[in-house]
Amino acid sequence: MSETIRKNIIFIFLLLGVCMTAQEKKQLGSIPQVLKSIIPDDRIDFWVLVHNHYGKNEELKISGAKKDYVPQSSGFNLFPEEDSFYYIAYSKAGKVDYITDLSGLKTFIGTIDNVEEAVIDATAEGYFIDEEFKNVAGNYYQDASNYYIDLGKLTSKECPYQKTHFTLTVNKSSGKVTGAKNNGTYIELYNKKCTNNPRLLKIEKKEVPADEPQKTKQPVRRK
């Protein structure tokens, strides 16, 4: 084998290794970690991320010289049906203001700077990181042009309670979602009140109809 061929083979293997590393899926951080990765678009003097859990405020991140702010009684969630909420207090040109909903959060983020901001942006459209099932709804990989993010979405609230996982393609330059691949349902739950519960339907099929004539017993012959 010539030296040139050997070098070409080594180069190909190195190139394949780089491609495989680039497409290796990584788990997204927890919801607080994702929120702490925000890089505001505007010139902000100060901002603080606050988590309110059962009325108790916890400051998760402080950026800039801290200023006085008023604790908020409501805020936003990045996961459906949470028992807590988040809000952001920030100061711009000396004026303190607050972020308490996802629409305001999107404006605060502005241009998508990282995969965490891409996830937050998608949350406004109903997608979320599922902390319990990150292997299907809480991971991503990337290449030079796009983020490929696996997230969950609540597609039915009852009969059944259903979660579906999607792969979103987010363009790094524009920050826009250019594709949403439906990967199917990963959670489907029926409660006792659901008339369309497959288990109940199977039981009903097995039951004998009330109007069906019963078989008469044959008399036992004695020898």
Describe each PLM feature range.
Residues A180-C194:
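Short, solvent-exposed aromatic-acidic interface loops
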Residues E117-F166, N171:
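Acidic, glycine-rich flexible loop segments
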Residues Q23-G29:
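Cleaved targeting-peptide boundary
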Residues D211-K223:
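Long, low-complexity, intrinsically disordered segments
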Residues F13-A22:
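Hydrophobic h-region of N-terminal signal peptides that target proteins for export
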Residues M1-I9:
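Bacterial N-terminal signal peptides that target proteins for export
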Residues P40-Y140:
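Surface-exposed acidic loop/strand-edge motifs in secreted or periplasmic proteins
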